[in-house]
Amino acid sequence: VKEPSAFFHQPFPEWQGLVQAGFTNRGDPNAPPAEADPGVPSAYADLNLGFRCGDDPERVGRNWASVLTASGLQGKPLVIPRMTHGDAMADADALPGGESQPPALLEPEGADAVCSGSSRFVLAVTMADCLTALVFDPGCGTVAAVHAGWRGTRARILEKSLRRLAGSGRIRPESALVALGPCLRAESLEIGPEVAAQLPGEFLSRIGGRFHFDMPACNRAQALACGIRAEHIRDQGACTLRDPDRYFSYRRDGPASGRMAAFISLL
């Protein structure tokens, strides 16, 4: 297993022999700047991992190849669901072709989470402000990647995903680990009153008369409600909006923002 890379954070370093996982950032801060490409937004010259944000798919594919090589996962099929900000979870092990030789990229439709009990796949979800969560149960040998923006958090996708996995015996809440990645933190996630009315009040605050939502705290509470131990929940703590040198942010940079990823694979 490769050592931690400058362009991703490993949330489960103590389990390197069983799992490889990471929350990526916008690129290696020590790397020389990419040569300017006229007409290409600057974000796309960084480590953009989103195939559906307007970047050249070939360039995105090369970026993914860099991440997978740095993490020792090259050669494995990549599973990235086509997300809808909902609460559905795809099972990579049940995807067509999953038992034989799947293509390099599998994109299950209409899911914002994906799980697997196999070492064949790299599971990933992408984001540019939304929270992502990685799930790993070292005893059961199950991994999952979850995309939970405010809509997914409202739909309780992390809670539902954990309950589905526990209900099918694929994780045990007392042994499962949950890692929360970089996202808009409460001080940066300003919302209007119409959105605030849809969210649990205990995770809302007022800053300068405006509503703010604590997305990580809400998802942490969902994990605890499923029986995940508090000491098994780890939060990277980074804010995408406030750290432009390390993270893309749709709210800060607009539609041409790149995308980061949360990825995980059994070894």
Regions found by a protein language model. Give the residues of each.
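Active-site microenvironment for binding and transforming phosphate-containing groups
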Residues: V1-L267
